[in-house]
Amino acid sequence: MKSFMASPATIERKWYVVDATGHTLGRLSSEIAKVLRGKNKAIYTPHIDTGDYVIVVNADKIKVTGKKMDQKIYFSHSDYPGGVRETTLKEMLAKKPEDVITLAVKGMLPKGPLGRSMLNKLHVYAGPEHNNAAQKPEVLEIKY
């Protein structure tokens, strides 16, 4: 008997919505990355994007442990000499809370074209409202 290999024609994608209120950043991001990769499905195939769509609401109400709010630093570079910019987690949550979850999940996905296609299925919103109601998302319970 041959092993089952998923193909793009055999994949059925669902939409899930996750409320980030009170959840720890890393634990929540890990669960989201599993769903985006499709590791929670029986048809998981490593070289095919078998994952589902995930909508995250209330990204500005995420929590972190310890002193990460002041000590965690995000780096970006403008490609010019001396163009390094540093932003703390506290500043990032004030300006762009969506990017905090997006960057955490991005680091947990494969690098390359497959990982980028998986990341495109993630939709993060700072507030409680999202504009994906037409997709009829199911609530994804995070159990910790």
Curated annotation (Swiss-Prot):
UniProt record, GO biological process: negative regulation of translation; translation
CDD domains recorded: Ribosomal_L13 (cd00392)
InterPro entries, per the entry: Ribosomal_uL13 (IPR005822), Ribosomal_uL13_bac-type (IPR005823), Ribosomal_uL13_CS (IPR023563), Ribosomal_uL13_sf (IPR036899)
Name under which the protein is recorded: Large ribosomal subunit protein uL13
Record flagged with keyword rRNA-binding: no
Domain of life: Bacteria
Function: This protein is one of the early assembly proteins of the 50S ribosomal subunit, although it is not seen to bind rRNA by itself. It is important during the early stages of 50S assembly.
Gene3D superfamilies in alphabetical order: Ribosomal protein L13
GO molecular function: mRNA binding; structural constituent of ribosome
Pfam families: Ribosomal_L13
HAMAP family membership: Ribosomal_uL13 (MF_01366)
Summary of subunit composition and partner proteins: Part of the 50S ribosomal subunit.
Entry-linked PROSITE patterns: RIBOSOMAL_L13 (PS00783)
Keyword tags: Ribonucleoprotein, Ribosomal protein
A GO term from the CC aspect: cytosolic large ribosomal subunit
Family: Belongs to the universal ribosomal protein uL13 family.
